Amino acid sequence: MVLTFMTATRRRPVVLIVRDGWGQNPDPKWNESNAVHLANTPVDDKLTQEYPSVLIHTSGEDVGLPAGVMGNSEVGHQNIGAGRIVDQEVMRITRAIRDDSFFSNPVVTGAIDHVKKSGGRLHLLGLMSDGRVHSDLQHGIAVIDLAKRNGLTGDQLAIHAITDGRDTSPRGGLKFVSQLTDHCEASGVGVVASVIGRFYAMDRDLRWERVEAAYNLMTQGTGQTFPSASAAIESYYANPTESSRDGDEFITASSIVPEGGSPITVQPGDAVLFMNYRGDRTREITKAFTFDDAAWKDIPGGGFDRGKKIDNLYFATMTGYETGLPVKVIFEKPAKMPNILGEYVASKGLHQFRCAETEKYPHVTFFFNDYRDNPFEEEEWGMAPSPRDVSTYDQKPEMSAEDITEKVLKQIKSGKCDMIIVNYANGDMVGHTGVLEAAIKAVEKVDACVGRVVDATLAAGGSLVVTADHGNCEQMIDPETGGPHTAHTTYQVPLIVVDPEFVGKPLREGGRLADIAPTVLALMGLEVPPEMTGRPLMETQTA
């Protein structure tokens, strides 16, 4: 078989629309819990009928994750921007644990040496779940093994468990924390010192009052007291703060204090290992622990009344969360990939625009550019603030889609853009709430906004690629529990090439996110650089 490329007329602008969390559920038995199926989507219906479309892979080995693991927005945008399969950090860390190199990593052993010298305590902080979007529970198990290997016993290892419920079942936390405590008991080392939901500990939108609750819990023991982690979780399940905050994500500050004991908190001379490997939801709590008093005083958003920085605290992070953070990094980022989409387009002297709302802004900029903090030449970034007047987006499923659309239309009208990357967060962020009716409204809002961008782009002589980074809102009922499904899916996602030249011509099947950048370049009339292993989806198999 030979792959023959169908040459495209150069288009300007070429617009890549990422409908975040909009997947294709292949099983009709879930139609009544499929927001994409239930929504009124005249734009998507029209595009699918008139232009070539295909399903592409967004999970597992197709995006550099373990087989069967769902994709996520960070991984998805990095793969899209790279034009190649990107080996993800979860794989690097897991390999290091399996080959034992993790246990001799100098940053890891440095934490052990620090507490032995100071007489302090080792703390394990992280999202305790098997979602493998932000963390992997098995990496936490490895830290317990690390403590045992180095002679720590009992509460010389304190675990601060952040519960998930967003990338996992809303009530899976009890199982995950039980796995931790069982391993601690079998190993003779480790106790759970605190439990709190990711809604608080993993904020990324400068809602510092949430981070304050987590920080005060871990440093002062501030929160409701329970005799065990399981008791804390079960209590919240029975008494959520409100109906829209049901499940692990929203568990309030819980200090675990056995009868006759006292809270175990982070103190001077201690060491903290933060096991999360994804950076966007770790930065705020990390800065609270590590910024000196002067830096904390000037922190964006105002921070909170933290008090003085904890003295002599060894703080290590599984990966590099942000350039310049005053932490020890266990696994440094690999060298930057050359000739990613943004860099390659910039090298041609072309203008590009990236746009998303706050929730997905890092994804179309930082992650899309392989963890680069600054734009390339002729690369412009635009952000629409995500709504701050609601605590969960089911209360405002339209989010900031209209604001994003206006910014993109302005760029198209200006005539200066060669490439535009836009993310609509609604399908993913509202899908995470598990509220079907709201997810339907989210899909409908995105569909309407996409229609406006499509019309303006075609009128300007451009073309579009309409797709997603992963699925979510096409599965709103959990197949195992029958309750709300709040996590991503492993389903494929649609990709539509909206270009008059390709009407009636099939797209190549079996594609993945790595093929999107080459597809965009082909529409722009540019050669695909050799570093990109993805191929344009306008290639077809011939005899």
Curated annotation (Swiss-Prot):
Pathway stated in the Swiss-Prot or TrEMBL entry: Carbohydrate degradation; glycolysis; pyruvate from D-glyceraldehyde 3-phosphate: step 3/5
Top EC class, one word: isomerase
Catalytic activity entry: (2R)-2-phosphoglycerate = (2R)-3-phosphoglycerate
Cofactor(s) needed: Mn(2+)
CDD domains: iPGM
Active site: S73 (phosphoserine intermediate)
GO terms classed as biological process: carbohydrate metabolic process; glucose catabolic process; glycolytic process
Cystine pairs: none
Binding site for Mn(2+) 2: D20, S73, D469, H470
Co-factor binding comment: Binds 2 manganese ions per subunit.
Binding site for substrate: H134, R166, D167, R198, R204, R278, G279, D280, R281, K360
A Pfam family it matches: iPGM_N
Any GO CC annotation of this UniProt entry: cytosol
EC identifiers of the protein: 5.4.2.12
One of the record's GO molecular function terms: phosphoglycerate mutase activity
Residues that hold Mn(2+) 1 according to the record: D428, H432, H488
Keywords: Glycolysis, Isomerase, Manganese, Metal-binding
Coiled-coil features, chain-numbered ranges: none
Family stated for the protein in its record: Belongs to the BPG-independent phosphoglycerate mutase family.
Role noted for this protein: Catalyzes the interconversion of 2-phosphoglycerate and 3-phosphoglycerate.
Subunit annotation: Monomer.
HAMAP family reported for this sequence: GpmI
Protein name (Swiss-Prot/TrEMBL): 2,3-bisphosphoglycerate-independent phosphoglycerate mutase
